[in-house]
Each structure stands twice: as structure tokens, then as C-alpha cells.
Amino acid sequence: MASTSSFRASSSSSTPSIPRTTTYDVFLSFRGEDTRYNFTDHLYSALGRRGIRTFRDDRLRRGEAIAPELLKAIEESRSSVIVFSENYAHSRWCLDELVKIMECQKDLGHAVFPIFYHVDPSHVRKQEGSFGEAFAGYEENWKDKIPRWRTALTEAANLSGWHLLDDRYESNQIKEITNSIFRQLKCKRLDVGANLVGIDSHVKEMILRLHLESSDVRMVGIYGVGGIGKTTIAKVIYNELSCEFEYMSFLENIREGSNPQVLFHLQNQLLGDILEGEGSQNISSVAHRASMIKDILLSRRVFIVLDDVDDLSQLEYLLGHREWLGEGSRVIITTRNKHVLAVQEVDDLYEVEGLNFEEACELFSLYAFKQNLPKSDYRNLTCRVVGYCQGLPLALKVLGSLLCKKTIPQWEGELKKLDSEPKADIHKVLKRSYDGLDRIDKNIFLDLACFFKGEGRDFVLRILDGCDFPAETGISNLNDLCLITLPYNQICMHDLIQQMGWEIVRENFPVEPNKWSRLWDPCDFERALTADEGIKSVETMSLDLSKLKRVCSNSNVFAKMTKLRLLKVYSSSDIDSAHGDSDEDIEEVYDVVMKDASKMQLGQSFKFPSYELRYLRWDGYPLDSLPLNFDGGKLVELHLKCSNIKQLWQGHKDLERLKVIDLSYSRKLSQMSEFSSMPNLERLCLSGCVSLIDIHPSVGNMKKLTTLSLRSCNKLKNLPDSIGDLESLESLYLSNCSKFEKFPEKGGNMKSLTELDLKNTAIKDLPDSIGDLESLESLYLSNCSKFEKFPEKGGNMKSLTELDLKNTAIKDLPDSIGDLESLEILNLSDCAKFEKFPEKGGNMKSLKELDLQNTAIKDLPDSIGDLKSLKYLSLSDCSKFEKFPEKGGNMKRLLQLILSNTAIKDLPDSIGDLESLKYLYLSDCSKFEKFPEKGGNMKSLTELDLKNTAIKDLPDSIGDLESLEILNLSDCAKFEKFPEKGGNMKSLKELDLQNTAIKDLPDSIGDLESLKYLYLSDCSKFEKFPEKGGNMKSLLQLILSNTAIKDLPDSIGDLESLEYLHLSVCSKFEKFPEKGGNMKSLRELGLRNTAIKDLPDSIGDLESLEMLSLSNCPKFEVLPLSLKAIDAHLCTSKEDLSRLLWLCHRNWLKSTTEEFDRWQLSAFIPESSGIPEWITYQNLGSEVTEKLPINWCEDPDFPGFVLSCVYRPSCDYSSAYIFCHDFKCELNLHGNGFRFRDVCYHECWCDCHVNFKDSRDLVCVYWYPKTAIPEEDHHKYTHINASFKSDEVKIKKCGINVIFLGDQRNHMPMLEHPQNSGDNGSALQDANGNVHGANQDDEHYHIPLLDLLRNLSLGDNGSVVLEDTLGNRKRRRNDSLPDVVEEPLYKRLGGPHTEISL
């Protein structure tokens, strides 16, 4: 048996909204004399045995009117099975049945199953063979019915069905047909709604995890936060797969099954689905029903979906264990509680994550706009909503429906409300998970939502444990319920879930924040302060000082907070974020913190009850000590960074629970109280306490202290001997303690110490006891300029993995250094007195990195070859180092060898034995003349840097470097010829031959199939690019600047991937190849200072070209529309520049109707005598503001603005040849309290043959399209502002020009300039109101080009539209114009005498 397509019932795509009452499952249509007593009879019996109610017409009584009964039977059947046999079409009754069946398929969703019984389906479809013969007999008497019959046959034959041949037993064929029909009739497609965005990837992933090909029982869990789409995914999978199973069931809303009656109903539904509707109403016990379910499932292959499970008991009575299920069964469980899935021991877990931005935007748009994308006016608002929803489908649907068909102001109002009040439909769904928590977990959740979101998990556990909460269990429960996530061990929470937590806190007293249990918003804090009864109920408070709108000077603000557990008063700038930065950066952050802290002004009478306080953070705490009534008995952590504390507290405090004290950058702290009252302290941070002179000897009593940070304590000179008693200390930081001179002898007793940081101190030596630090892993002594000798016993530190001696006064290392068997990193760079590496250094078998750069070392001992683990060796800038040791080739794991700027002359042949070496740097080795022949054996080498060496050629073996990706030979003045076999380097991606004596390249260069970058600039003898160079299909950049090249071969057009081609300063280059236009990927073309006179028309075919640099303005008629920047600052011809600007402007006008980037086009040109007349500059200096024309946003003839400035390079580099200046151009539109800002950064290269003092002014012009400004905000803006900034140039003057579509004909008449009113005049005004430039008394003068474009456009039939000084448009038709200028516009602009098509 062969199926014509899939085993899938065919029905109409549109089903009736009202369900039909059906009497039969199947209506059998067949030709009686063909199959009544054989195939059809057997099929009818088989269908009956499967419980499929089947109608066949031979059950009718003889003589009864058959037609109406048939019609009714078909209508009352869910489906039809059509047996197409040899003589089927010879029966008009059969054909009429068929017509009715196909009508029901279209109108009622009637399923149709065709069977082609020993007939060719194509004969049925095309009415050929016996079907054609039958229709030939109908032509005379039944012409009116023939079209309907033919259509019905064709449609039925096109459906999926079965083609029965004589190649199999008929009984087997009937069994398969019956089973397939049974499955398809039993399939109940679940309603999944419309707008299923992003569902496909979830369904695909889940089907993979179900392993349908396996005969094992498999259970997969889907979990995620409420509203994320778990049920929808499960329904789609059910619809997709249920027909593949004989028995299936989808049980929804199981979380409600905690109620026995609901559980009873669910059990009955499951039994009914499996037993085909029979159920088990006579069994009342839930337990007995569970036993019955087990017995029934065990013998069947089932597909079951259990949706929204939240308790194990629900699974116990519905599914039990996997042992209940028959072979090949599949179960999907959806839940918010991951723990349920873990206990059920599902085979796989699938977490549903939120939609990505594009998917979220599409889903929201389908509900808000009834289309896939947001309307242009609503794009920014849509982004705000999508950002708010963070990929949650429920929220996107609810808010999309809410905002549908509302105006922009209404959107803004709704979004403002969302900040303080979530939508009820979203809140209700999310809150279900919270409602299922016990009292303690609810408290933990609210603490996380209102205080701890974004904090590290270990920190949160520590504080919550201090609150006497079972923190580990609570956080695990919340994670299982998807109320939080723990990426990178951090407490994270969806913003909508956090907002749900806030709403729970507010719900009893929505407008009385003084009664809330938690405060997190500064605005709510300020409102709470106004309450007469004070703030009594608060347990946690997080206060961002930077957001306080007014100064709080109430010293009693905390007086009634008797329940306060967690208090965080913090600055927007965290001083810890500046750690490691410069002193200036730290000072800047410190100033911000202190400025924020000044908003809380407390008097000496300040008090607050701290009996319940577990966590206190107060950045910039203003008083010199904590209040007298401060208790701290339950305090776990105390953070008073950047405070005014001089002494923490007075008298004795019982601080048994205290684990962390952080007083960093408390600059007035001169001493710490004795430490005996805090025996459990684990971390003490006093970094930046610049007044701290010493550490109290009682520090040794803190047996649990693991971290002590004293960085940048500038007055600290030593540590007490009791420091050695810190038996748990792991990290000790003393870096930047500039007066710290001596490490205590007893410091060696700290047996747990793993990290000791003494960077940038005044220490001179270390005691011998340092060798007793048996756990020490990292020792930092860099920039200790007085440190001269490493102790002999230092070799006893068997755990040491990193030793940093950079920039110390050390001269040598003791032989015991070889005993550091765990050492992996040794840094001796910048030790100017270090001359000799010890022979026994080769014993450091674990050493991976050895940095000796910029030392006085002359050679290395042969034992260096014994460093079998060494991967990195740097000797750069060792000016006395002359010879690499022969045995160095034994370092089989060496990856990187840096010998740059040494006195080395050659390398030993053993260098070829470095089989793992990837990077070899020899740049600036001025005596290095010859690369070894055996160097080609380094099969792993990926980068070889020979820049600025004395090398003349390369050996043929260079071609054997099969892994080489980068070869740098730049500035090798003696290098003349690239080897022919160099073409064998199939992995080479970058070849740098800049400033060499090379004359040509071999043809084999075309074999470098991976080459992406080829640099030949400043090769003054290089004359010809090889014809076969066009074979380098991967080439992205070809730099030929300042060579002797005259032309390029036509094959250059074959460089299909080339993006950058630079030929600047090629003084002999005269002709750009016609086929150059084939380089479809070219983005940047540099032709400055060439001898080229014109460009071929094919230049317009460079469809990706964005940057074009020119000199002498060669003639060309077209520019690519993709062009974004043109640099013509060396052009001197006024006429050529005019033509260039005209082409730019024309291109920009064309592009305003197409897709574009925000900054569509920019040009850099000289300010020659004619250019200032074309561009109106409204202001001296670097910034200008103008009023926008009335109705600028609605005007279809207004495409955008031109921003422009005149500048001059400001640096005085007399020897400079090429100078790069960076521009920052900022555009601002503002008005009515709204602002739009856009910034463009652009880089322009200047060939400077003279001092900058003698250079001429240059002009920068930006064309900016209106459509880059969000349309929904157009009506808000009244003014436009432009500013230009650059560190390398001085901005002299600038302007904004409003463009309106101008003359589209061959020329444009000149107009008399309107009287200067300030807005539209071309004169310059300085800050004092003085006018420069134009003479206001002149009656006639040439209007600048951009003024002309600003004030002139064509109306219908050639009428001229003028703007007055207020921006109002006036129409003049057939008015005579002043005959001041007769020269056509195209001559004045240099534009071609052709029509402009926009």
C-alpha cells in the first residue's frame, strides 16, 4: 500500500463557530457493484470493530427515497471515506454524493479520506481512463452537472489518502487504514489562539527532547515563570503529535487539583480520554481511580500532557511513576515549580525563556497595531513597552490589547501609570506563584524584590541567615518556582515579578508609604517623612541618595523604625568601581559620593533603634561616630564607605554576629577600636583610610578573619606582630601603602594565607619567615622600587603559583627559586638591574609564563630548555640580549616567544623544534638578517613578526608554515623579493610588506586563498600588481598607497570580497580600471594625490561604496547611492568642487526616499573662494541654534538639514605627513520639554606637506535626513541645534541649513535675497551680536546655494514657492523674477546639464 501523501485528514481551514451534532463518525461512499461484497464490506467491519460509527447506503430500505437520506447522513457524519474504484464515476449517485461531501468539507470542516482502489489517482484527478469514459457518456444529458462533478473529483484526488495496489495483503492494508482513521478522528485539536510568535523554536527543541524514535517511556518537563507560554507550547506540541499515538489526553489547570472534587474530575477526564469516553463514574475513591489508571495505562502507548502542576500529590493520583506507562509512551509536564519535576525524575527539563526583542516587538505589534511591525510614529513608544515587558508574552498581549487604537498621548499616560501600578491581568497571573509560598518564603521573596535584586547569592545568604531565615532553602524554593534566577551566582528577577512584589507591599496601604513593610523608592521615602506618626512598620529600606529631590535634615527620621532589619543608604557612584583606577578617577568618584551624601544632614542628636538591624550600608555617613544608642547585637555587616567616621563607636559593644566591616575611604578614620568584641569577623576593609596610622594589636584575636584590605593607607608603616595569629586569613592587601617598609617576622605564621599584595610599597626585603607561608599562592611586589633581594627561604613556598617582581631593584634570584615547584607565572619585567637568570631556574617544572622584558639580561642558561611547561617567554626590549640558546628548542609547549627590540642576530636551527609555537615576534631587531631554513618546521606558527629587521629575503621553507596567518615584514628596508613558494601558505590571512624594497609580487600570490589583508604602502619601487592577484577571493583590504604603481589589471574586478582599496599618493597612477566597478563589496576607495583625471562610469556600480577620498577632483558623472562620506579636502578647482557638491546633494535627495543610516552623507572640502558663498554660516564658533520652520515635519518637500562648519587643524607637527582628525558632530532638536539627540563620529585623513600653521581652512558638510528623527516626536520640537567638536582641529564657524526640494529642471533662476532679518541672513553673528560678512545695504547679490535650496522649491506646473522670514510658504505663479543673474544653475554648481530624477 502506498499513501499519496501524509496520513493526515483533510478538512477546511475554516471551521464553523457552532459545534455540529453528529450521528456518525464516517460516511462510506463507494460503487456497490465494484466493492460492496469484498473490500468495502471488510473495511466497514474493521471500522466497526474499532468503535467507529459508520454509515453505508445499503442499510436503507428498498424503495425508500435515497437522495434526502444520503444528504442528511453526510451532513451528520464527522468524515467521509471515498472508495474510488474502476466504475465509481459511472454512478451518478456516487458523483452526487461526492459533490455533497466536498461541500461539507468546505462548509462544515468535514474530514475526507480518499482510497484509490486499484485505480490511478491521476485518472481520478484528470478524469482519464474509466473516469474519462464515464464522463463521455454524460456529455449529452448531464451538461449542467458535469462541471461540479469534475471539480469534486479533482479536489478529492488532490487530498491525502491511500493508493491500494496488488503488492500487499488486503487485510493488512485495511488494518492500517482503519488505525489511521481512528487516530485522526480521535485527535482533538486544542485551541492555541492566534499570533504564535517565536513558538517554532520551542516546539522543535521539545520534540527533539521527546526522542520519539525511542521505544522507551520518556517524560519531559517544561518550566518557567507564569505567562511565559508553557501551556501554549504544550498545546502546539499536543496538536502536532497526538495523531501519532493511539491514546492521548491533555489535562489543563492541574494546580486546581488540590481540591478533591477537581482531582476527581481530572481522573475521570483522563480515563475518559483513554477509554474513549466510557469513564468510571461508579468508582468514587480517588485512590481506587488511581489504581484503575495504572492498570489501563500499563498496556497502552499513550501521549499525556499534564498542564500547570504545582504539587507532587497531583501527579501521584494522575500518573504515579513511569512504571505505570506502556512502552513508547510520552508525558509532558508543565509547571512553575522546577522542584516538582526533579522529584518526579523526568528525563529532561526545558526552561522557557522570554522572547527576544524582535519577537517581542512582533507579538506586541500584532495586538497593538494588528500588523507585524509597529507604526512609524509609535516606534519609540513600542520599544519602551517591549523593554518593560522583557519578553513576557502575557504582558505583551495584555498591553498590546490595552494600547490598541489609542493616541500617542494616551500611550504616554498608560506607560506612566505602569511605573507605579502593574496591570491587573498580569499581576494576577504572576501572583499565583507567590500565593503558594509559606510565610517565611514570602518574606524572603519580598526582601529579594525590594532590597537584594542584583546582589550576589553568597552575600544574600549571609544576611538572610542573620535574619534567622532558612535562606538556602528559601532561595532554592524561589528559584524552583521561577520567581528568581541565579545566573553567575547572582540574584536576578524579572522586572514584572519585582513589580508584583512591590504591589504586594503596597496593596493594604497604597497611598501611605509610612505603613509599608519595605521602602525602595526615594519618592516614597520623602512622602513617608511627611506622615505625623512617623515610619514605624518598615523592615527594609533602600535609599538612592542621588535620586532624593530635597535635603533631609530631620535627625529623628529613623527614631521610630523599631522593626528595621536592612538599611542601605547609598550613592549612585560606588567607590569600589574605581579601585585600580588612577588617583584622579578615585577622587572624582569620591566627590560624587560626598555630594550625594550631603542630602542627608544629621545632627549629633541623631538616633535610631538598631536592635533588629542585620545589615547597614551608609555611603558618606556624615557623623564622626555611630549614635550612642547604636546596639548592633544582631548586625551581620557594616558598610560605611567614604564616611566622616573618626571612631566607630564609644564604649564596649557586643558584636558576636558581625562578619563584615567596610570603612574604605573614610579619610578621617585614625584608629580602629579594639577587635575583641567581634570574634566572628570575616572581612575587614580599611582601604583608602589615609589617616590610619596603625592597626590595633587585638587584630590577632579575630580567628575567623579571612580578608584584610589596607590598600592606599598612606600613613601605615607596619603591622603588629599579632598579625601572625590570624590563622584563617586568606587575603592580605597592602598595595599603594607608600610608607609601608617592613613585613612582620611573625607574618610567616599565617598558615592559611593564599594572597599577599605588596605592590607599590616602600618595602625593601622580606623576612625569612615568608618561606613558612605554606598556602601562599600569589605574591605581588611590583613597583616596589626599593626591593632588592628575594629571600633564600622563599623557595619553601611550595604552593606559590604567581610571583610578580616587576619594576623592582632586584639584581638576581637565589638558586632556591628552582624549588618553587608550583610556580606558573614569574614576572621580572622592567627590572633594570636584573642581569642573569639562575641556572637552577630550569627546575621550575610548572612554570608557564616568564616575563623578562626590559631587563639587563644578556643570555639565558641552557637549563631554560628544561622548562617543559613554559608557554610564554618575553625578552622584548632587552637591548643586551644577543643569542637565543640552542637548547631553547626543547620547550615543546612554548606558544609565544617575544624577542622584539633585542640585539639578536639570528636564531638557532633548533627553533624549528618548537612544535607548539604560535607567535614569534622579532620586530625592531635591527641586527637580525636571516630567518633559519628550519624555521619552516614550526607547523603551529600562526604569527611571525619581522617588522623593521635587517632581513633581505625569506627561505623557500617559509611556504611550509601551513598554519601561518599573519606575516609582518613592514619597514624591512632591505627586503626585495617575496618568495615564489610563499604562495603555499594556505592559511595566511594578513601580509604586511609596507615600506620595503619590494618591486613586484610573484604570480603565486594569487594562491593565497585565505589572504584578507595585503599592505604594500610606501613601497616606492613597487610598480605592478600581478594579474593573478585577482584570484585572492578572500581579500578584504588592499593598501597600495605611496607606491610607483601606474595602473591595475582588469582582474582587480574579480576581488569579490574586497572592502578597502587605497591608492592615495600614487603619483603615477593615471587610470582606474573599467572593470573596477565589479567590486560589489568595496566600501572605501582612496584616490588622493594620484594622477587620475577621470573615473569610469562603472564607478557608479560600486553598490557598497561608503567612503571616497579624492584629490584634483577627477571628472565623473555619477556617484554610488551607497556613498556616506566623500573626502575632497585637497581639491582646488572651484568648478570641480561645485560639480562634486551638486552630485552629493543630488545623491542625498535621491536617497531620502530609500533606506539609509542616520547620517546619510558627509563631505570634507577646502574653503576656496567660492565655497563660502554657497553655504550659510549662522554663527562664529562651534555651536549654532535656529528656530525650526513652521510645519517642518508635515512638509513633504522638506527632506532634511545640512550641518556644516569651517575648521583648521590646530596641532603644530612640522614633520607630519599624514594627519587624522576625528570629528564629533551633534544634532539636537528640542522644545516643549522634549529633546532628540543624535551624534556622528567621523574620521578624515589629511595629507599635510606643510606646517599646520600654514594650512588652509577646510569645510565639513553633513546632510542629515528628516526621516532619521522619530516621527511620533516631530510635532514637539521647535528649535534645532548643531555643535562640532574635535581635539585635533579648531572650529571657526558653523551653520545649519534647512533644505527644501529645489529646481528639478536644467537650471534655476537666481533670486534677489530677501532682506536680512536675522533668521535667514547669510551674515555671521558673534556672541556679542556683531555682524560679519554680508553687507545689509546690498540690493542684489548671489544667494548662497544652501540658502537658495532653503528658500526655493517648485510647485505644480513650475510655480515657485518662497519662504518668508518666519518660515511661511508663499506661492508665486508666472511672477517675473529679477534679471540679476542669467547664468544657469548647473554651471554655477558644476552639475551636469541633465534632468534630476528624484
From Swiss-Prot:
GO terms for cellular component: cytoplasm; nucleus. It catalyses: NAD(+) + H2O = ADP-D-ribose + nicotinamide + H(+). It is an enzyme of class 3 (hydrolase). The gene is RPV1. GO terms for biological process: defense response to fungus; positive regulation of programmed cell death; signal transduction. A motif (Nuclear localization signal) lies at residues 1369-1373. Residues 1315-1328 have a biased composition (Polar residues). InterPro entries: Apaf_helical, C-JID, Disease_R_plants, Leu-rich_rpt_3, Leu-rich_rpt_typical-subtyp, LRR_dom_sf, LRR_R13L4/SHOC2-like, NB-ARC. Residues 22-185 form the TIR domain. Residues 201-440 form the NB-ARC domain. Its EC number is 3.2.2.6. Signal peptide: none annotated. The active site is at E97. This is Disease resistance protein RPV1. Gene3D superfamilies: Helical domain of apoptotic protease-activating factors, P-loop containing nucleotide triphosphate hydrolases, Ribonuclease Inhibitor, Toll/interleukin-1 receptor homology (TIR) domain. LRR repeats lie at residues 203-225, 423-447, 478-504, 535-560, 610-632, 633-657, 678-702, 703-726, 728-750, 751-773, 775-797, 798-820, 822-844, 845-867, 869-891, 892-914, 916-938, 939-961, 963-985, 986-1008, 1010-1032, 1033-1055, 1079-1102, 1105-1128, 1346-1369. Its main location: nucleus. The TIR domain mediates NAD(+) hydrolase (NADase) activity. Self-association of TIR domains is required for NADase activity. It is found in: Nucleus; Cytoplasm. The lineage of its organism: Eukaryota, Viridiplantae, Streptophyta, Embryophyta, Tracheophyta. Residues 1315-1336 are annotated as: Disordered. Belongs to the disease resistance TIR-NB-LRR family. The keyword Repeat applies. NAD(+) binds at R31, G32, E33, D34, T35, R36, G63. Homodimer; homodimerization is required for NAD(+) hydrolase (NADase) activity. Disease resistance (R) protein that confers resistance to multiple powdery and downy mildew by promoting cell death. Acts as a NAD(+) hydrolase (NADase): in response to activation, catalyzes cleavage of NAD(+) into ADP-D-ribose (ADPR) and nicotinamide; NAD(+) cleavage triggering a defense system that promotes cell death. The keyword NAD applies.
